[in-house]
């Protein structure tokens, strides 16, 4: 697993300290173990988890701005846990409505010694953003419209951003953005060994 992670990181042009690599591998180990009982992800193979969960999350890191982030519909902690590992100076609130997922996240937090994450069990519309966040991240929403509708109260006005992880570039959705939302950029993400396209849509909340 260590060799596989090293080769993926090298292919992606990402350099990480050993401690962060060990934390990422520890997270995959826990995800694999808990998945057998809790069905946290449809990805069963730990090697594939490295590609589809770890690399697919941390390639977002260079594009994030700010220190306080919320991962909405985080599931088993994606992309929030891998991002928290590689951004130890930032804080990540991990929001999910299912108790079993939040229990898993708390165990990950404890075992990996992550002091910069806060797992929260809540529906997004009931979660108060006090203070508002620098960034709202998600790969859980089917559409940008859904994300903006459910999460409109979370980012800091004028400087907060939405970071939506998508497959193909959602050009049609981008023509239907509501007032007060500005398209900042669409980034084509390069994820080694991942089939299909990946894009990061960055929207600013004005």
From Swiss-Prot:
Q: What does this protein do?
A: Specifically methylates the N7 position of guanine in position 527 of 16S rRNA.
- HAMAP family tied to this protein: 16SrRNA_methyltr_G (MF_00074)
InterPro entries of this UniProt entry? rRNA_ssu_MeTfrase_G (IPR003682), SAM-dependent_MTases_sf (IPR029063)
Q: What is this protein called?
A: Ribosomal RNA small subunit methyltransferase G
Q: Which GO terms describe its cellular component?
A: cytosol
Reaction catalysed by this chain?
Answer: guanosine(527) in 16S rRNA + S-adenosyl-L-methionine = N(7)-methylguanosine(527) in 16S rRNA + S-adenosyl-L-homocysteine
Q: Which organism is it from?
A: Serratia proteamaculans (strain 568)
Provide the taxonomic classification: Bacteria, Pseudomonadati, Pseudomonadota, Gammaproteobacteria, Enterobacterales
Tell me, in one coarse class, where this protein mainly resides. Answer: cytoplasm
